[in-house]
């Protein structure tokens, strides 16, 4: 007794925890579940504690009732749902093969499933009847690993028989990815017409051009030899031709097709597509399902800009962040403008580059404007602005594009011009109350917002809002910091003001502070600051994340190729794939690009020296600063 009292004295614990300790702790073993499985498997291997016998195809399989009930809905309903099997020592299982039942029980006891071509079908049948989603998923994955042109119809039948929508979608994806080759097989013509119609209507159909869709539609009804020899009748066109997006075909191909057709509905359709090509100026206003790109790849894209090395070079390169590779690639279209700091807008998946700087020899503002069409990789020069605008901002509101203020290197501007794609014309709308340049703008909830900038030599922190319905400007609360040559982005009901520079310290410095304006509360706040300086950056928003591309760092005294991505949910910045060159004045946007472009080998990628990557040094030479003098920032 004395020893017990001594032990109690020794082991006495405090009844009241101190403030620095929590009352309870919960511990979780990472090995418990595997140990439990090993224990259950040992019981099965030793034949211990079996309490039910499954009778399958006349053969007996002993098992543990509680484990079966815990493993799937079928056995849970049988053994815990008030059915007669609750009291039976032997339970008859119908519709399942003995081998498949052994496979499934092995999975229940071990979490392992061995599949082969000889057992996958009966295992899938059993898993569907016994309602075991994991095994169904494994069987579908195994089948997809063996799918080819010869057996795909059989797998489709299995998917239909057991209502396996996920497997059907995987089979559809297989055909969409291999359409050109598959459309030349006999199995293609054995698919139901409705299935082929659905596949040919998909934006995920992987073709290099729309002509391959046209040929694929014909190959469902005619042999390859008949199509190649033009031994087909199109007076009553096959229904599948409804899925062909004729305006996406090249005009020369359409003209040849039109010339050989007699009077027919198809000829009228082709004539409409030819008219689309001839009315190039009106194409953005003629968009519909027939002109939609067969792609779901939305990419961050950058146009133009100015490099620092080997000399000050205005870029005519367009670059995009390839979502498949996670790296930047170049694509070059003929007649691409060689500019920097252009205003940029996207309307109906056309890119508009508005005004900007052409500062190769001295300062020169631009009034010229261009439009890029990713459907045909083609540039088109649209109507010029009514006056030159450098260091402007450009926004889309509704069906119009607005070019706001800027400067012409003689005067600061307050003028605002509005572009109507339907008439290819610019008109003046209500000007700003005061001149501003090097500002930034974005659109939110049908209104246009601009922030900060410069007026003369002064840096601003002003905020203005334009209401197109009343054609009026309203002044909002000032932002928290002066800045210019920055960027703006809109997410949810918030405006983000990012990057730029000011001279609050008495000399030009980067602004790392990121300001956020709530259109609901009409108040400013600050979010996570930029990890590096970005003056004259490209800005784009994709998947609720803000991309900040390149620009100038006055703290470093150089242009940069950095890419930083802001995650609003986490309020943090991440490093993105770095640009191939140090560049400022990049005009950035988000654009749907053709699948064929993303799968092409890169061509025409400029071979710039490695010195460009190392250009972000803290100290610059006199010649470097002379190069900087040709930038938009002064």
Curated annotation (Swiss-Prot):
Give start and end residues of every Kelch repeat. Answer: 299-349, 350-399, 400-446, 448-493, 495-544, 545-593
**N-acetylalanine modification, residue list:** 2
Compositionally biased tracts (Acidic residues): 624-634
Among SUPFAM superfamilies, the record links this protein to:
Kelch motif (SSF117281), POZ domain (SSF54695)
| Single GO MF annotation | 14-3-3 protein binding
* Function (record text): Substrate-specific adapter of a BCR (BTB-CUL3-RBX1) E3 ubiquitin ligase complex required for chromosome alignment and localization of PLK1 at kinetochores. The BCR(KLHL22) ubiquitin ligase complex mediates monoubiquitination of PLK1, leading to PLK1 dissociation from phosphoreceptor proteins and subsequent removal from kinetochores, allowing silencing of the spindle assembly checkpoint (SAC) and chromosome segregation. Monoubiquitination of PLK1 does not lead to PLK1 degradation.
**This protein is called what?**
Kelch-like protein 22
- The species is Mus musculus
Organism lineage reads as: Eukaryota, Metazoa, Chordata, Craniata, Vertebrata
């Amino acid at each position: 007794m004395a020893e017990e009292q001594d032990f109690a004295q020794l082991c006495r614990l405090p009844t009241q925890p101190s403030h620095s300790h929590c009352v309870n702790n919960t511990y979780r073993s990472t090995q418990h579940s595997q140990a439990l499985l090993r224990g259950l498997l040992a019981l099965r291997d030793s034949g211990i504690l079996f309490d039910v016998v499954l009778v399958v195809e006349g053969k007996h399989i002993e098992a543990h009732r509680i484990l079966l009930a815990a493993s799937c809905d079928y056995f849970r309903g049988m053994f815990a749902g008030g059915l007669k099997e609750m009291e039976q020592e032997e339970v008859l299982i119908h519709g399942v093969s003995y081998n498949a039942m052994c496979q499934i029980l092995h999975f229940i006891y071990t979490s392992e499933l061995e599949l082969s071509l000889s057992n996958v079908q009966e295992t899938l049948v059993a898993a569907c009847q016994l309602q075991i989603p994991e095994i169904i998923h494994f069987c579908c994955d195994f089948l997809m690993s063996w799918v080819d042109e010869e057996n795909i119809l059989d797998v489709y039948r299995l998917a239909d028989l057991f209502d396996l929508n996920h497997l059907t979608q995987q089979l559809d994806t297989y055909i969409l990815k291999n359409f050109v080759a598959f459309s030349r097989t006999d199995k293609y013509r054995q698919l139901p017409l409705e299935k082929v119609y659905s596949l040919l209507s998909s934006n995920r159909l992987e073709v290099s051009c729309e002509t391959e869709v046209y040929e694929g539609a014909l190959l469902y009804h005619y042999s390859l030899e008949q199509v190649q020899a033009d031994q087909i009748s199109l007076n009553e066109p096959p229904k599948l031709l409804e899925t062909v997006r004729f305006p996406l075909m090249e005009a020369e191909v359409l003209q040849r097709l039109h010339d050989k057709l007699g009077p027919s509905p198809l000829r009228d359709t082709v004539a409409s597509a030819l008219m689309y090509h001839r009315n190039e100026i009106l194409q953005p206003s003629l968009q519909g399902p027939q002109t939609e790109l067969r792609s779901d790849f939305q990419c961050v894209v950058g146009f133009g800009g100015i490099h620092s090395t080997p000399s000050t070079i205005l870029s005519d390169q367009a670059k995009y962040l390839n979502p498949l590779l996670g790296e930047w690639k170049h694509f070059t279209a003929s007649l691409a403008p060689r500019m920097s700091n252009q205003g940029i807008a996207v309307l109906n998946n056309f890119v508009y580059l508005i005004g900007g700087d052409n500062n190769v020899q001295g300062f020169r503002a631009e009034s010229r404007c261009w439009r890029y069409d990713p459907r045909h990789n083609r540039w088109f020069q649209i109507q010029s602005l009514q006056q030159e605008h450098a260091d402007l901002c450009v926004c889309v509101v509704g069906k119009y594009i607005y070019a706001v203020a800027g400067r012409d290197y003689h005067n600061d501007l307050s003028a605002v011009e509005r572009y109507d794609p339907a008439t290819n014309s610019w008109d003046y709308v209500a000007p700003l109350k005061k001149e501003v340049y090097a500002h930034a703008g974005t659109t939110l909830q049908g209104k246009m917002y601009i922030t900060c900038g410069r007026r003369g030599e002064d840096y601003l922190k002003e905020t203005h809002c334009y209401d197109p319905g009343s054609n009026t400007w309203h002044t909002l609360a000032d932002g928290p910091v002066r800045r210019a040559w920055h960027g703006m982005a809109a997410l949810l009901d918030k405006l983000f003001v990012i990057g730029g520079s000011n001279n609050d310290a008495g000399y030009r410095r980067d602004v790392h502070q990121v300001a956020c304006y709530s259109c609901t509360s009409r108040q400013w706040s600050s979010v996570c600051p930029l990890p590096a300086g970005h003056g004259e950056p490209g800005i784009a928003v994709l998947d609720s994340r803000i991309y900040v591309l390149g620009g100038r760092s006055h703290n470093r005294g150089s242009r940069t190729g950095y890419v930083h991505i802001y995650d609003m949910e986490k309020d943090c910045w991440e490093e993105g794939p770095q640009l191939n060159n140090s560049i400022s004045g990049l005009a950035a946007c988000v654009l749907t690009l053709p699948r064929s472009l993303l799968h092409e080998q890169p061509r025409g990628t400029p071979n710039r020296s490695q010195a460009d990557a190392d250009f972000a040094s803290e100290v610059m030479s006199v010649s470097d600063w002379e190069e900087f003098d040709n930038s938009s920032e002064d």
